[in-house]
């Protein structure tokens, strides 16, 4: 669920997903189109693609099971669809953490959608 995604971001990145990633670039936040603008925006693009491939459950609403082992998030549970949602969220949170050094709020926070018109790469 989106609430769990926020929790994973807090655990992995030590930042609020709501405040750092809800309106960044062309893909972080609701919707998304155009070409990702930087590495962080690409994390969101890949996350959107990942959610788009999930079938049989609702990535934004359905809860999943995970644990923490040696500081890493480990997705679990018996439902393969929910485990897939967890993996989408886990990979995105790690991607955010790994790209904090290039996060550029001055340029990409509340980035105008008119700048997101280029043809995107395929998922």
Swiss-Prot record:
It catalyses: a 1,2-diacyl-sn-glycero-3-phosphocholine + H2O = a 1-acyl-sn-glycero-3-phosphocholine + a fatty acid + H(+). One of its GO terms (molecular function) is toxin activity. GO terms for biological process: arachidonate secretion; lipid catabolic process; negative regulation of T cell proliferation; phospholipid metabolic process. InterPro entries: PLipase_A2 (IPR001211), PLipase_A2_Asp_AS (IPR033112), PLipase_A2_dom (IPR016090), PLipase_A2_dom_sf (IPR036444), PLipase_A2_His_AS (IPR033113). Transmembrane segments: none annotated. GO terms for cellular component: extracellular region. Disulfide bonds join 26-116, 28-44, 43-95, 49-123, 50-88, 57-81, 75-86. It is found in: Secreted. The active site is at residues 47, 89. It comes from the Eukaryota. Binds 1 Ca(2+) ion per subunit. Keywords: Calcium, Disulfide bond, Hemostasis impairing toxin, Hydrolase, Lipid degradation, Lipid metabolism, Metal-binding, Platelet aggregation inhibiting toxin, Secreted, Toxin. Ca(2+) binds at residues 27, 29, 31, 48. Its EC number is 3.1.1.4. Its cofactor is Ca(2+). Snake venom phospholipase A2 (PLA2) that inhibits ADP-induced platelet aggregation. PLA2 catalyzes the calcium-dependent hydrolysis of the 2-acyl groups in 3-sn-phosphoglycerides. This is Acidic phospholipase A2. It comes from Deinagkistrodon acutus (Hundred-pace snake). The lineage of its organism: Eukaryota, Metazoa, Chordata, Craniata, Vertebrata.
